[in-house]
UniProtKB/Swiss-Prot annotation:
This is Photosystem I reaction center subunit IX. HAMAP family: PSI_PsaJ. It is a single-pass membrane protein. One of its GO terms (cellular component) is photosystem I. Its main location: membrane. SUPFAM superfamilies: Subunit IX of photosystem I reaction centre, PsaJ. One of its GO terms (biological process) is photosynthesis.
């Protein structure tokens, strides 16, 4: 359990950083598909 408590925040931080990076890159190349007026 102690190993899980030490690795979970690291995995979560890497996951959120990767997700944010993918969204930023996608928005840079395809801005109209992500934020299109409804």
């Amino acid at each position: 359990m102690k190993k899980f408590l030490t690795t979970a925040p690291v995995v979560a931080a890497i996951w959120f950083t990767a997700t944010a990076g993918i969204l930023i890159e996608w928005n840079r190349f395809f801005p109209d598909l992500l934020f299109h007026p409804m």
